[in-house]
Amino acid sequence: GNWVLKTAVKQCADWRKVLTDFHIGVNISYVQLCQDNITEMVLDTITEAGIPGDALTLEVTESMELQDYSYFNKIFYEWKRHGIHIAIDDFGTGYSSLGYLKSIDVDEIKIDRCFVSRIYCNNYNYRLMSNIIKLAHSSQIQVCCEGVETEEELTSLQQLIPDFLQGFLFAKPYTKEELEKLYMCKESLEYQERVERERKLYQISTIEEKNVTAENERDEIVNIVEGMDEVIYVSDIDTYE
């Protein structure tokens, strides 16, 4: 676990020489969090690599049971004080409950794919996802929906306005060499194909965002009218318009 963290942070530092705002997320396990020196080890790792804390997100494996909230919150507080972002991975599985949102001091929850899959034809999951996102946002917690694989899922999720979307629809896992071709070599065919694919996805997102805005405006007008005790209609006496 610690080797993975150090290797990932070192790689992040290398890529930031090309992409200056590159950000990396690394899983951190319950076993690691229970190490006596974990707080200092993480801070020493980013210092040695020469990257700022805000270039790193530590994704806590959500399926584990974090019973000692005060202990873990002290660790998270120290990391966050140095700019490190804390996320709960696979939210909604294992020991998860909405109680995490009031007990653990995190910046982000990553909602598991089981809630995302075919959300466009599952009203229960859609309502549940909507409520989770609203509750998280009310606590100033960002939301990432994991496992987005189809344009239909993207369209439905856009209506719920999460902060981030993640999944094979946008990108699959890449090797170091593949990622560099896709994001750092502008002359490569892979880079150009990625840009075109992302442009099309952006168009889908923009169209859906406009539709949601229009729906919200209509709903607002309906709510105003329904909230009135009396509605007076004024029309032209000749044309009735």
Could you describe each region identified by the protein language model?
Residues 15-20, 48-53, 79-82:
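Short helix-capping segments at alpha-helix termini
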Residues 6, 29-36, 48, 55-69, ...:
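EAL-family c-di-GMP phosphodiesterase catalytic domain
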Residues 1-12, 41-42, 75, 132, ...:
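Structural preference for long, well-ordered alpha-helical segments in enzyme cores
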Residues 212-238:
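Sensory modules in modular signal-transduction proteins
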Residues 45-48, 103, 238-241:
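PAS-family sensory domains
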Residues 10-17, 21, 237-241:
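PAS/LOV-family and closely related PAS-like sensory domains
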